[in-house]
């Protein structure tokens, strides 16, 4: 049905490659590209499909990307590289006439700040080129938006309150490790919190607001209010929302390590001089922390991510909770990666599938909740991320 190029051979890229290879009726030709070609070759070896091509590319270099795109001629690029590289890859797609999908919005390397505005400005250029760009097609962002669109389509006339809840109840048996790129992860959770209420954004101190929430099959966990990028698009696309928040669980040991990292200056993203060299402390820390790709083998427990929604249907107030639980061990057995990589990589593959099937094909730049959620929801059940519903239960929020 179509040729796909995956950029990035980390944990998420590895999962995307496995899942793409499992669907040969949709993805007829596959290439994996990364700054380090040997990482791509290792992914292909693990999958056991010698027909998957690999290539070396610097995703910060538009000319290199254009040369690769023009050579392989993919119909769609799945960008699971770093968020810093979103704009160079989008530029290369426009120059080469290639469609685009990513899992995280752009953020500049020198400022710990992320928002969709940089990518939304590409809308007219993609429209004029007749190309589709699908933004934020991981789990959160991604499935969280699709869950919201599904709820709006089937369960509510008006969504008023949205709480996205993300729990990782797994144990990787490390003193401290992040589940995806440490640099991106630590930048995200050390920023101020932010939530939307009554038409305004309310800013909080980092991890200032927290409460215990109960997660299916897991139980109560301390959950902390963070700012997460999908809130920005969801309140725009569902203007009836009065309040939208995002919650994530952290254990006390993790938070203690995080405080120490900040207090000793290792979370800094500016350059410091060391032995006559310029280094960024957070990038150095990333080099000595466990690689998220290596956590899967001994990872136990599961993730639970969902949307808790309150709103009106036929004039009456209702609640709706939709979620997925994902086992780290099952994810590892299938792809060699842990559940956090799995829950991001599977939706990215499904989004590309939706495009190649013509179901999510529309010139412009779009967030996932702007498409029909139904065929995507059907594939979640088939591809390893089954969802569950609780109607008119206690949302706790």
Predicted regions and their residues:
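Rossmann-fold cofactor-recognition segment
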Residues: 47-61
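Hydrophobic/small residue at the entry helix of a nucleotide-binding pocket
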Residues: 12
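C-terminal catalytic/substrate-binding lobe primarily of soluble NAD(P)-dependent oxidoreductases
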Residues: 153-397
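Conserved Rossmann-fold cofactor-binding substructure of NAD(P)-dependent oxidoreductases
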Residues: 59-72, 85
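N-terminal Rossmann-like NAD(P) cofactor-binding module of classical short-chain dehydrogenase/reductase
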Residues: 69, 75-79, 100-101
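Helix N-cap at the beta1-alpha1 junction of Rossmann-like dinucleotide-binding domains, i.e.
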Residues: 36-38
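Rossmann-fold NAD(P)-binding glycine/threonine-rich loop
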Residues: 104-131
């Amino acid at each position: 049905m179509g040729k796909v190029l995956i950029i990035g051979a980390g944990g998420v890229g590895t999962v995307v490659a496995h899942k793409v290879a499992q669907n040969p009726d949709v993805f007829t030709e596959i290439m994996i590209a990364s700054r380090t070609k040997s990482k791509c070759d290792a992914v292909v070896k693990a999958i056991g499909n010698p027909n998957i091509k690999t290539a070396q590319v610097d995703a910060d270099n538009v000319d290199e990307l254009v040369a690769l795109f023009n050579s392989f001629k993919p119909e769609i690029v799945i960008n699971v590289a770093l968020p810093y590289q979103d704009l160079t890859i989008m530029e290369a797609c426009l120059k080469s006439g290639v469609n685009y999908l990513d899992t995280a919005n752009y953020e500049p390397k020198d400022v710990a700040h992320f928002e969709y505005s940089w990518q939304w400005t590409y809308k007219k250029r993609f429209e004029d080129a007749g190309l589709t760009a699908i933004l934020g097609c991981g789990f959160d962002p991604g499935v969280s938006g699709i869950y919201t669109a599904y709820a709006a389509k089937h369960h509510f006339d008006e969504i008023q309150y949205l709480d996205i809840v993300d729990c990782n109840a797994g144990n990787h048996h490390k003193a401290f490790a992040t589940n995806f790129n440490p640099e991106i992860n630590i930048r995200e959770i050390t920023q101020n919190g932010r939530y939307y209420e009554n038409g305004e954004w309310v800013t909080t101190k980092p991890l200032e607001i927290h409460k215990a929430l109960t997660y299916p099959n897991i139980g109560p966990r301390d959950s902390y209010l963070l700012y997460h990028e999908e809130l920005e698009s969801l309140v725009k696309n569902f203007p009836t929302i009065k309040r939208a928040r995002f919650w994530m669980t952290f254990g006390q040991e993790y938070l203690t390590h995080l405080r120490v990292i900040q207090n000793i200056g290792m979370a800094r993203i500016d350059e410091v001089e060391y032995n006559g060299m310029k280094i960024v402390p957070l990038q150095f820390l990333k080099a000595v922390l466990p690689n998220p790709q290596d956590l899967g083998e001994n990872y136990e427990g599961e993730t639970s991510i969902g949307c808790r929604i309150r709103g009106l249907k036929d004039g009456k107030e209702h609640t709706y909770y939709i979620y997925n639980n994902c086992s780290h061990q099952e994810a590892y057995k299938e792809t060699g990666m842990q559940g956090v990589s799995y829950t991001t990589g599977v939706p990215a593959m499904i989004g590309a599938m939706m495009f190649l099937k013509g179901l999510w094909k529309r010139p412009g730049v779009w967030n996932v909740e702007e498409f029909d959620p139904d065929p995507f929801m059907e594939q979640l059940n088939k591809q390893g991320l089954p969802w569950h519903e609780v109607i008119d239960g206690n949302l706790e929020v």
